[in-house]
Each structure stands twice: as structure tokens, then as C-alpha cells.
Amino acid sequence: MQDRNFDDIAEKFSRNIYGTTKGQLRQAILWQDLDRVLAEMGPQKLRVLDAGGGEGQTAIKMAERGHQVILCDLSAQMIDRAKQAAEAKGVSDNMQFIHCAAQDVASHLETPVDLILFHAVLEWVADPRSVLQTLWSVLRPGGVLSLMFYNAHGLLMHNMVAGNFDYVQAGMPKKKKRTLSPDYPRDPAQVYLWLEEAGWQIMGKTGVRVFHDYLREKHQQRDCYEALLELETRYCRQEPYITLGRYIHVTARKPQSKDKV
């Protein structure tokens, strides 16, 4: 079973993900967490791996802050878009681009990295535990993993709010092969277990878009964005709202004491 490659719909991906309030909100909440992680890691410049980094929006922002960023992606088109965006922002010297799948990145890295970004990729890979093991192997002891994944509970809630009862009863099968709907929505409890069994120490959990997608009046997503962001920020790091997020962002540390595997 192959992992998803976005070469065929790179433009649609960019427009639908980042050209909307859902993309803006996702980035806003994500960066609240990342700013906290960076503050905890101290003032030094970091080696950052953005695994499956797509067109590089998050990676470029890291590079703008002076960090050395390695971006890998399975899609050649996404790599090209990321390179162009990095050049436009003037951060190409702080970035390295590798055309490979996240699970193959270890052979391209000479030394471990300090921070790994793995955002909205886990729900597209057929063997998630293998990918997480690879990421563990390329992270230095004491380093941090920033993992954001598509939440199966959020998908179910979204469909129930929409009244898609038959679809939920049928187990929410994927309707088309080549769409932006993830292949493998993840159960958060399962993901947390995978991390803990592998030795990661979970530092924090955040629901991403815990209200936005459920609004009855969709125009409020745009017209009331600032108020919505304020309320998302207030509730997104407490239950039950974490588990209602369309995505969940987990930060986890690789312990100093455990040897690299």
C-alpha cells in the first residue's frame, strides 16, 4: 500500500488548506504551541526537520527565525513550491530540500536534528508506527517532536453535526481515492499509545479547530474570525475540546536517558 503523493493536486491542496480560515486558524494555534516549544528549548539556533513539509509554510517561518531547516516531501511539486517560496522570502540559505518520503529521510541526514515537525502526514501513511520509529532515530536525545494528525473523533463529530447518519453508520468510508480527505484518520488514544510505547514523553496536547468547523453559520468563520480564534485559544488545550478538534497537535520529547534506536 502506497503513501499519498500530492503531485496531482498540489495547487488544490494549497488553495484549500492555506487559502481559508481553517488553514489560518490551524497555523495560528499550531504556532502558539511551537512558540512555547522554542522558548523552552532556549535561544540557540536549532536544526529542524520538517518531515512531509509540503510547500513549506511552517518550515519557512522557522527559517525566518534563523533556524536551519531541512524539508523533505514525497511530492516533487511540493518541493518545487517550497523552494520558490523560500527564495521569495529570502531564506534559501537556511533551508535544505530533500525529495523523499518521511520514512526514508534517515539515509539523507548525517547528524540528528533538534526538532521535528510532522504535521498532517500521519493520516496519509500506511505504516504510522514505522514512520514514528524513523523520526525517533533522527532526533537527538532531549529533542522534541511536533506531531499534528487528523482526528477520527473530529471527523465523526463533523459528520454527525452535518446529519450524515448513513455515512457514519457505514463507518465513514473514503468516497474518492484522489481527494484531500485523509486515508487514515487517527484515533488519538491510539496515537498517544504509540508514542508512549516507543519511549516518547508527551509534553502537551492541543485540539486544532475545536469549534470552527462545527459553526452553524459558516460565514462566522470569516466574519467573526478574531473572536473565534480567541475562544479556540481559550478552550483548545482542555478536554473535552482537545478530542473534538479536527486535528490534534501533540508535542513529545525524546528522553535524554534513552539510547537512539
UniProtKB/Swiss-Prot annotation:
One of its GO terms (biological process) is tRNA methylation. Disulfide bonds: none annotated. One of its GO terms (molecular function) is methyltransferase activity. Gene3D superfamilies: Vaccinia Virus protein VP39. This is tRNA 5-carboxymethoxyuridine methyltransferase. It comes from the Bacteria. It catalyses: 5-carboxymethoxyuridine(34) in tRNA + S-adenosyl-L-methionine = 5-methoxycarbonylmethoxyuridine(34) in tRNA + S-adenosyl-L-homocysteine. Keywords: Methyltransferase, S-adenosyl-L-methionine, Transferase, tRNA processing. CDD domains: AdoMet_MTases. The lineage of its organism: Bacteria, Pseudomonadati, Pseudomonadota, Gammaproteobacteria, Enterobacterales. Belongs to the class I-like SAM-binding methyltransferase superfamily. CmoM family. Induction: Expression is positively regulated by H-NS. Pfam families: Methyltransf_31. Its EC number is 2.1.1.-. It is an enzyme of class 2 (transferase). InterPro entries: Cmo5U_methylTrfase, Methyltranfer_dom, SAM-dependent_MTases_sf. Changing R26A: Lack of activity. Catalyzes the methylation of 5-carboxymethoxyuridine (cmo5U) to form 5-methoxycarbonylmethoxyuridine (mcmo5U) at position 34 in tRNAs. Four tRNAs (tRNA(Ala1), tRNA(Ser1), tRNA(Pro3) and tRNA(Thr4)) are fully modified with mcmo5U in stationary-phase E.coli. Also present at low frequency in tRNA(Leu3) and tRNA(Val1). S-adenosyl-L-methionine binds at R26, G52, G53, D73, A102, Q103, H119.
